[in-house]
């Protein structure tokens, strides 16, 4: 629950006007991923949700790769704020 609270604070504070930015999209994907993982802990055989989770993970991965190539400083800050692992493929 603490992670969800910190994400909501970040989204309200920084991205109120700029909803199309890469950071805001990654933030929304992270919210969806955390919500789906908690759902899948209860419903292990929900294969459609698993497929949706994999799609969202792929989209977030591509956006993070783009952000790491274009804006390395913003990428590092976002990784720290959202507490996401830094992948080595970027």
Swiss-Prot record:
GO CC annotation terms, alphabetical: plastid; ribonucleoprotein complex; ribosome
Extract the GO molecular function terms from the UniProt entry. Answer: structural constituent of ribosome
Q: Does the keyword Ribosomal protein apply?
A: yes
Q: Which InterPro entries match?
A: Ribosomal_uS15, Ribosomal_uS15_bac-type, uS15_NS1_RNA-bd_sf
**Record's keyword terms, sorted:** Plastid, Ribonucleoprotein, Ribosomal protein
Lineage top rank: taxon: Eukaryota
Name its cellular compartments: Plastid
Q: What are the GO BP annotations of this UniProt entry?
A: translation
Bilayer-crossing regions: none
UniProt-listed SUPFAM superfamilies: S15/NS1 RNA-binding domain
Query: Could you say which protein family the record assigns here?
Result: Belongs to the universal ribosomal protein uS15 family.
User: Assembly and partners?
Assistant: Part of the 30S ribosomal subunit.
The name on file for this protein is Small ribosomal subunit protein uS15c
**Which organism does this sequence originate in?**
Cuscuta reflexa
């Amino acid at each position: 629950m603490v992670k969800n609270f910190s994400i909501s604070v970040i989204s309200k504070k920084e991205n109120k006007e700029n909803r199309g930015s890469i950071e805001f999209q990654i933030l929304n994907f992270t919210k969806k991923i955390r919500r789906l993982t908690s759902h899948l802990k209860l419903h292990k055989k929900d294969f459609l949700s698993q497929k949706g989770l994999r799609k969202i993970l792929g989209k977030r991965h591509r956006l993070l790769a783009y952000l790491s190539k274009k804006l390395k400083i913003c990428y590092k800050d976002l990784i720290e704020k959202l507490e996401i692992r830094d992948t080595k493929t970027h």
